[in-house]
A protein has these predicted regions:
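Conserved glycine-rich Rossmann-like NAD(P)H-binding loop of the short-chain dehydrogenase/reductase
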Residues: 24-40
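A glycine-rich helix->loop->beta "capping" turn
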Residues: 66-78, 84, 98
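Catalytic loop of short-chain dehydrogenase/reductase
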Residues: 82-86, 90-106, 114, 118, ...
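Structural signature of the Rossmann-like NAD(P)-dependent dehydrogenase/reductase core
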Residues: 6-7, 78-79, 130-137, 176-181
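Canonical Rossmann dinucleotide-binding motif of NAD(H)/NADP(H)-dependent dehydrogenases/reductases
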Residues: 1-29
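C-terminal helical subdomain
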Residues: 159, 179-182, 191-229
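The beta1-alpha1 cofactor-binding region of Rossmann-like NAD(H)/NADP(H)-dependent oxidoreductases
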Residues: 35, 51-63
Length: 229
């Protein structure tokens, strides 16, 4: 039995990924900050729930202790992410970017990935086939920079996630650690402006969560295959 933790899994891409992996036979932990929403999502999916705020050391440590006590972990999906907008709801470009905005975005999108991954590495190292999937974005690609999206902090955070993916993959060659680009998916993150459904967006996350020990590692993929960044 494969045991999987998905951060930010009470809605959107995380929720759909949980649904699909449960259907594939995984035991899934829905990680969510909000206890009520997380428990409701887990109950609806037939998943387990663990309270998990990726910005809080104590919350992450408690989640790791819970999952360790209940049997361990094979797959980690770092899905939780945010985009910070202006009080008027506008995307914040470089001209209006402040250190506070950058810090807020990085706290979840970058430091959250590091915090969670670091906490769960001891559990993953005990797995026979450990996998980490970091949910990135096409906006992480330097080749795509400047094409349509004017924001500064969110793309920078996802580019950082891609580099972290490479470095973690080098450090832990037995693990399959990859970044994925789900596509512009209609979720709360973009006020449901995305052109894809969550079913379409979750496709590459689900695929890479099931990659075998002989599969790729240290890569960046969308549903069509490897991407340059």
């Amino acid at each position: 039995m494969t045991t999987t933790l998905i951060t930010g899994a009470n809605k959107g891409l995380g929720h759909e990924t949980a649904r699909r992996l449960i259907a594939a036979g995984h035991t899934v932990y829905v990680g969510a900050r909000d206890i009520e929403r997380g428990r409701a999502a887990a109950a609806g999916l037939g998943a387990r729930f663990v309270q998990l705020d990726v910005t809080d050391d104590a919350s992450v440590a408690a989640a790791a202790a819970t999952i360790e006590a209940e049997g361990g972990l094979d797959v980690l999906v770092n899905n939780a992410g945010i985009e910070v907008r202006s009080p008027e709801g506008e995307i914040i470009g470089a001209a209006d970017l402040t250190a506070d905005v950058m810090r807020e975005v990085f706290e979840t999108n970058v430091f959250g990935v590091v915090r969670v991954t670091h906490a769960f590495l001891p559990l993953l190292e005990r797995s026979a086939a450990p996998v980490v999937v970091n949910v990135s974005s096409s906006l992480a690609s330097l080749a795509q920079a400047g094409k349509g999206y004017p924001g500064a902090a969110y793309p920078a955070s996802k580019t950082t996630v891609n580099m972290l993916t490479v470095q973690f993959a080098k450090a832990f060659p037995r693990m399959r650690i990859n970044s994925v680009e789900p596509g512009y998916t209609a979720t709360d993150l973009n006020q449901h402006a995305g052109v894809q459904t969550v079913e379409q967006g979750a496709e590459i996350i689900v695929r890479m969560a099931q990659v075998g020990p002989d599969g790729p590692t240290g890569g960046y993929f969308d549903a069509s295959g490897p991407l340059s960044w």
